[in-house]
């Protein structure tokens, strides 16, 4: 799979109906994937969004992130099989690790994120075959589970969302591909892909069959500074108290050159002083310039090309604001 995708789900002002409409428009313009991010920020849920998108489109590959443990693996497999049926076999899934921060958010006891992700993926894949299966792991345990309907496909691709070195290695070991995080530079992407590629090789798997996708934050305006300001809020979310513990350090350890350790305390102090507004104001232009594709149409095209040059096969583009969505589709139409 190669090409350009369209991403939604992070903007709290965009309704499910609006998301589905933009997915349809993306399909009309030759985009290859529509992707929804179900986030720890408690925006819209993935099942509702993908049902709407599935009914609004006919050819677009559709996918979403879903954090494991929040849903039982049987429920996740059942939902995935149902959505794959609804869409005529167009689904991919990005099951993500339940970090300690996620566990705290959802009132769960912390359990090893790599272990739970691996077991959820293994269990879901077995259930998706349509056979009667039992699974007994450290965390996941069930007997005699079988879908009561024949799945459209017995294997739906899993693009594992990963940010840290551990997550990237795990994606190479168990995924059909990887979905690299948003708010990352092309330099980070190149480093991350090298880690994944090594893990694929060590697992004895075929790199040619592996899919590399990434959500790329895009902000298109006629004025460069205005484009930076439109997407600065999304960069800031990666440094709020919810996401900071599992985002900043892991990205730096992979080699993200635009996050400076000395800035972390500044972001924390800004949040304590004035919440989201103060945090957004504290994010330097260099962060926005480096870790998003923001600027004029030509500047954004050039930046997205740098992600492809780094090895990303499917650049999944997410507009920073609703008023930019149409322009993004026009700029990147096939």
State what each model feature region is:
Residues 2-8, 34-36, 61-66, 91-95, ...:
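Hydrophobic faces of well-ordered beta-strands that scaffold small-molecule active sites
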Residues 13-26, 46, 76-79, 162-173, ...:
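Short, acidic/polar
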Residues 24-28, 50-59, 80-91, 172-173, ...:
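Acidic (Asp/Glu)-rich catalytic clusters
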């Amino acid at each position: 799979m190669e090409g350009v995708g369209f991403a939604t789900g992070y903007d709290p002002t965009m309704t499910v109906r609006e998301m589905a409409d933009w997915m349809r428009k993306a399909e009309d313009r030759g985009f290859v994937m529509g992707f929804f991010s179900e986030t720890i920020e408690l925006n819209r849920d993935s099942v509702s969004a993908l049902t709407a998108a599935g009914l609004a489109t006919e050819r677009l590959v559709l996918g979403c992130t879903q954090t494991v443990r929040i849903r039982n693996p049987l429920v996740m497999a059942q939902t995935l099989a149902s959505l794959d049926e609804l869409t005529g076999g167009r689904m991919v899934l990005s099951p993500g690790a339940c970090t300690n921060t996620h566990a705290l958010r959802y009132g769960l006891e912390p359990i090893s994120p790599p272990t739970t992700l691996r077991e959820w993926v293994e269990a879901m894949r077995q259930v998706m075959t349509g056979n009667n299966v039992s699974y007994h792991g450290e965390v996941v345990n069930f007997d005699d589970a079988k879908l009561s309907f024949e799945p459209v496909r017995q294997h739906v691709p899993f693009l594992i969302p990963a940010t840290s070195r551990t997550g990237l290695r795990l994606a190479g070991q168990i995924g059909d591909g990887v979905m690299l995080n948003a708010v990352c530079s092309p330099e980070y992407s190149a480093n991350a892909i090298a880690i994944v590629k090594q893990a694929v090789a060590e697992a004895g798997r075929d790199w040619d069959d592996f899919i590399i996708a990434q959500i790329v934050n895009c902000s298109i305006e006629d004025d460069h500074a205005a484009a930076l300001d439109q997407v600065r809020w999304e960069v800031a979310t990666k440094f709020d108290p919810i996401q900071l513990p599992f985002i900043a350090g892991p990205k730096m350890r992979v080699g993200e050159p635009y996050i400076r350790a000395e800035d972390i305390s500044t972001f924390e102090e800004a949040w304590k002083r004035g919440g989201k507004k103060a945090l957004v104001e504290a994010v330097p232009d260099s962060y926005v310039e480096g870790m998003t594709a923001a600027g004029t149409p030509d500047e954004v095209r050039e930046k997205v090309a740098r992600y492809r040059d780094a090895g990303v096969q499917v650049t999944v583009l997410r507009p920073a604001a609703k008023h930019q969505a149409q322009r993004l589709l026009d700029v990147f139409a096939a």
